[in-house]
A protein has these predicted regions:
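N-terminal type II signal-anchor transmembrane helix
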Residues: 4-51
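A structural signal for short, hydrophobic/glycine-enriched beta-strand patches
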Residues: 37-186
């Protein structure tokens, strides 16, 4: 009988432990979705169309976030889309400057010069394209836009899935920012 009672206690303990783990897992998943929903809701009014962005006033620059190169050093398809959108905003006079921010941490990998080359090939004067060679993450790109390039008001260009996070970071860093998604393929 004692053995049976110990076995029942052990089973009860295992069930409680499993229930606690499932509850903890569900809370973690809920927290992730909750934070994501909060971030998206807090900046939703800052996501604009190209036309709306062109109507903004006193914008310092259009910030194009880097996102990878092909093996030959040309922009990846996603980066190409971002650059096209950034160039279009510049051409519509949404801002007087284009700030390209990306990874140039190794000599053989240089997102920012590839980005600048693309912009120049589209007719943007070299002196209107600023390069941030240390934009290794979204946070670093936005932080450096504020602290290195003295940006106070900007339009951020990235894919829609990434735009809310970039705008939220800008908001938390005290930058007045709007965003335009670069998703011509969807």
């Amino acid at each position: 009988m004692r053995r049976e009672a110990r076995e029942n206690k052990r089973k009860l303990l295992i069930r409680r432990l499993l229930f606690g783990l499932v509850l903890l897992f569900a809370a973690g998943i809920g927290a992730v979705f909750g934070v994501n929903a909060y971030v998206q809701a807090s900046v939703q009014d800052r996501i604009l169309t190209e036309e709306q962005a062109a109507e903004l006033e006193e914008i310092d620059c259009v910030l194009v976030l880097g996102c990878g190169l092909e093996a030959d050093g040309s922009p990846s398809p996603m980066l190409h889309d971002r650059l096209q959108q950034g160039v279009a905003l510049y051409q519509k006079e949404a801002a007087p400057k284009l700030l390209v921010s990306g990874d140039h941490g190794r000599e053989e990998y240089d997102e920012v010069n590839a980005m600048k080359r693309f912009a120049e090939e589209q007719g943007i004067p070299s002196e209107d394209v600023f390069m941030d060679h240390a934009g290794f993450s979204t946070y670093e790109s936005v932080y450096r836009a504020r602290d290195i390039f003295q940006v106070r008001r900007m339009v951020i260009v990235t894919q829609e899935y990434h735009l809310s996070r970039a705008l939220y970071i800008a908001k938390r860093l005290g930058i007045e920012a709007w965003g335009v998604p670069a998703d011509p393929r969807t």
